[in-house]
A protein has these predicted regions:
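Non-catalytic N-terminal regions of enzymes
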Residues: 1-186
Length: 186
């Protein structure tokens, strides 16, 4: 049977207090120099590398489920239909691709709500910084958006350290298999 982790009152409050004009997720933006990536950058390669790393982070494969009759805070359960394609996206900056355009697109992406039927995170590869192609050694921005109900500052930093590495030859993380059994809330 699947282990259920109930949200604390504090974490649940981030869900309850969220509105359409006040999303309560946290975002980080990483700027990467793709000329330092062994073998170069491609979006499909980045997505494939993320797929390996996300297999080691169960939090990124869990979604919320309401408690029986919705009498208590929601619980985290394995998303049995988890699909990385729903979470990792690619977008190009309009010319000239400077700080103003990057800030505008990041602000827009940050204003969009997360789909509560899925794990509460998204990642966006933002290509075209300074009008350069990241496949040809240009810079790349990566915006990661995670709901505050799922992470706090320390947890977010730990997750980012699992997703990213500064060692190009670092071994892949050990996968954590999906929970066995069926979702007891179904």
């Amino acid at each position: 049977m699947q282990h259920l982790q109930r949200l604390s009152g504090l974490d649940a409050s981030f869900l309850y207090l969220e509105t359409s004009t006040q999303p309560l997720h946290v975002c980080s933006v990483l700027e990467l120099d793709t000329s330092t990536i062994p073998g170069g950058y491609s979006f499909s390669r980045m997505r494939d590398e993320l797929a390996v790393r996300i297999q080691a982070i169960p939090t990124f494969r869990e979604k919320l489920a309401n408690s029986f009759l919705n009498l208590d805070h929601p619980v985290w359960v394995e998303d049995e239909e988890f699909d990385l394609e729903r979470h990792v996206h690619r977008i190009g900056l309009p010319a000239p691709g400077g700080r103003v355009e990057l800030a505008e697109i990041c602000g827009h992406l940050a204003s969009l709500p997360l789909d509560r039927r899925r794990p509460l995170w998204e990642m966006w590869a933002i290509e075209g910084l300074d009008g350069q192609d990241p496949r040809k050694g240009g810079r790349l921005a990566v915006l990661t958006k995670v709901h505050h109900a799922a992470v706090d500052g320390v947890t977010g930093a730990n997750i980012m350290s699992q997703l990213c590495t500064v060692e190009p030859d670092a071994p892949p993380p050990v996968p954590v298999p999906a929970s066995q059994g069926t979702n007891p809330l179904r």
